[in-house]
Amino acid sequence: MIEPLLFGIVLGLIPVTLVGLFVAAYLQYRRGNQFGL
């Protein structure tokens, strides 16, 4: 019972983590461009 639940949690966390990293990198890139760095 625990393994499928853990597998589902991991499958749910991976895309959220990737999207979070992408958004953070995009915001940092935009902020850097605004400051001319």
Swiss-Prot record:
Membrane topology: Single-pass membrane protein
GO biological process: cytochrome complex assembly; photosynthesis
Record's protein name: Cytochrome b6-f complex subunit 5
Organism expressing this protein natively: Rhodomonas salina
GO terms for cellular component: chloroplast thylakoid membrane; cytochrome b6f complex
Compartments, as annotated in UniProt: Plastid, Chloroplast thylakoid membrane
Main location: plastid
Family: Belongs to the PetG family.
Keyword list, A-Z: Chloroplast, Electron transport, Membrane, Photosynthesis, Plastid, Thylakoid, Transmembrane, Transmembrane helix, Transport
Role, per record: Component of the cytochrome b6-f complex, which mediates electron transfer between photosystem II (PSII) and photosystem I (PSI), cyclic electron flow around PSI, and state transitions. PetG is required for either the stability or assembly of the cytochrome b6-f complex.
GO molecular function: electron transporter, transferring electrons within cytochrome b6/f complex of photosystem II activity
Transmembrane segments: 5-25
Subunit (UniProt): The 4 large subunits of the cytochrome b6-f complex are cytochrome b6, subunit IV (17 kDa polypeptide, PetD), cytochrome f and the Rieske protein, while the 4 small subunits are PetG, PetL, PetM and PetN. The complex functions as a dimer.
Pfam families: PetG (PF02529)
